[in-house]
From Swiss-Prot:
Free-text comment on this protein's domains from its UniProt entry: The N-terminal domain determines nucleotide recognition and specific binding, while the C-terminal domain determines the specific binding to the target protein.
Record GO biological process: bis(molybdopterin guanine dinucleotide)molybdenum biosynthetic process
Gene Ontology terms: cellular component: cytoplasm
Essential cofactor(s): Mg(2+)
Places the protein is found: Cytoplasm
Pfam families: NTP_transf_3
Keywords tagged on the record: Cytoplasm, GTP-binding, Magnesium, Metal-binding, Molybdenum cofactor biosynthesis, Nucleotide-binding, Transferase
Gene Ontology MF terms: GTP binding; metal ion binding; molybdenum cofactor guanylyltransferase activity
Gene assigned in the entry: mobA
Subunit (UniProt): Monomer.
Positions contributing to GTP binding: 13-15, 26, 72, 102
Family: Belongs to the MobA family.
Listed name of the protein: Molybdenum cofactor guanylyltransferase
Length: 191
């Protein structure tokens, strides 16, 4: 059976300050013998010919994992909304999968489920876990870029709040779903 999945761009957000990691760049922190970004890259690379990483430092280290790198338009690590805006601006496809660099257990099944949901609803799709939205696991239609830019211009800095201003389909996942684990502290790397 042919693959009915529409072409998508992949946007991996790696532009954070890494405060809970003692200032270390989370995507480059080793877990099971390789950087966290390598684990995410291995899952998403077969899904797209357009892999974008939003990073504000260590570009030389991230280059091997991306087709293109982008940085935030503003200095001082303004947050994931800025990274999503920067990534949507350069994405080549109409659908963009958004993931965090510190989610090494994400799998193809989850990503494809989000993509199917987004396409079926012709709107954004985001994971909901235990009743909470998880914007770092989402698929966005590129056409939401102007709305996100408007939200930014109006002072919004929360990716979740900006996304929820538009129609969003929720992909329900169990609270215990390890695929959604974010390894954003040294303690989590011991899991």
């Amino acid at each position: 059976m042919p693959d009915a999945r529409p072409p998508c761009s992949i946007l991996i957000l790696a532009g954070g300050r890494g405060q809970r990691m003692g200032g270390r760049d989370k995507g480059l922190v080793d877990w099971r013998g390789e950087p966290l970004i390598a684990h995410v890259h291995r899952v998403v690379r077969p899904l797209s010919d357009d892999l974008v990483i939003s990073c504000n430092r260590n570009q030389a280290d991230y280059r091997a994992y991306a087709d293109r790198l982008v940085g935030d338009a503003e200095a001082d690590f303004p947050g994931p909304l800025a990274g999503v805006i920067a990534g949507l601006k350069v994405a080549r496809h109409g659908w963009v999968v958004v993931l965090a660099c510190d989610a090494p257990l994400v799998d193809r099944e989850l990503i494809e489920g989000l993509l199917r949901l987004a396409v079926a609803g012709n709107s954004a799709a985001m994971v909901r876990q235990g009743g909470f939205w998880q914007p770092m696991f989402s698929v966005l239609p590129k056409r939401v870029l102007p709305a996100l830019e408007q939200a930014w211009a109006a002072g919004e800095r929360s990716l979740q709040k900006a996304l929820l201003r538009e129609a969003v389909q929720g992909l329900e996942c169990a609270e215990s779903d390890r695929r959604l684990s974010n390894f954003n502290s040294p303690e989590r790397l011991q899991d």
